[in-house]
């Protein structure tokens, strides 16, 4: 076993841990599984990057045969080990997100507050989250559920198309009228 250090998006690391917990795996096992899926499917490793997304450095213990698989994929695609691991995790999340992975924001409001999907900052109210999204991330650069790139104008329409609770949650937040109606309710109380 060797310790391998790599860079990963903070929210993807959180989703990976949720996936591992749901399937009774360790983080290392989840990464090994993601690499094997990527290798067996012979998926061409395409770089998945979103500008302005913070990457964090993390380390895992992996067997030498897994590291050699990572190196082989890295050499074939002419990218780094970190890129291979990031892509393997990304593909794992893409395939499992709609069915198995709850969005970070689905956790209870009282305990966690609302979580920004892009930088994993926590906010006590929807209003605070919405203001943060507008100022810091210029709205919704990509869908937090299915990772599809979005333009700000079509974000609300994208969320409205889907009936699953995850997309509906973001539809509720992306609506323009949500803030004003919420303010009126607060005034009434």
From Swiss-Prot:
Span of zinc fingers (C2H2-type): 114-137
PROSITE patterns associated with the record: ZINC_FINGER_C2H2_1, ZINC_FINGER_C2H2_2
Alphabetized Pfam families for the sequence: RHH_1
GO biological process, one term: regulation of DNA-templated transcription
Keyword flag Transcription regulation: no
Keywords, alphabetical: Metal-binding, Zinc, Zinc-finger
GO molecular function: zinc ion binding
InterPro entries for the chain: CopG (IPR002145), Znf_C2H2_type (IPR013087)
Protein name as catalogued: Putative zinc finger protein ORF189
Lineage: Viruses, Viruses incertae sedis, Bicaudaviridae, Bicaudavirus
């Amino acid at each position: 076993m060797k310790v391998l250090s790599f860079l990963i998006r903070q929210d993807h690391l959180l989703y990976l841990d949720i996936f591992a917990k749901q399937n009774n795996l360790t983080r290392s096992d989840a990464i090994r599984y993601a690499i094997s899926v990527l290798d067996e499917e012979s998926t061409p490793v395409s770089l998945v990057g979103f500008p302005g997304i913070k990457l964090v450095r993390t380390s895992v213990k992996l067997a030498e045969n897994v590291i050699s698989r990572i190196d082989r994929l890295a050499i074939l695609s002419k990218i780094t080990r970190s890129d291979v691991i990031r892509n393997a995790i990304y593909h794992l999340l893409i395939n499992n997100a709609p069915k198995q992975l709850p969005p970070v924001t689905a956790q209870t409001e009282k305990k966690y507050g609302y979580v920004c999907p892009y930088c994993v900052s926590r906010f006590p109210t929807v209003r605070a989250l919405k203001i943060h999204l507008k100022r810091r991330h210029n709205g919704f650069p990509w869908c937090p559920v299915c990772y599809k790139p979005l333009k700000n104008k079509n974000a609300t329409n994208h969320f409205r198309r889907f009936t699953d609770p995850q997309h509906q949650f973001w539809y509720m937040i992306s609506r323009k009228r949500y803030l004003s109606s919420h303010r009126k309710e607060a005034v009434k109380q």
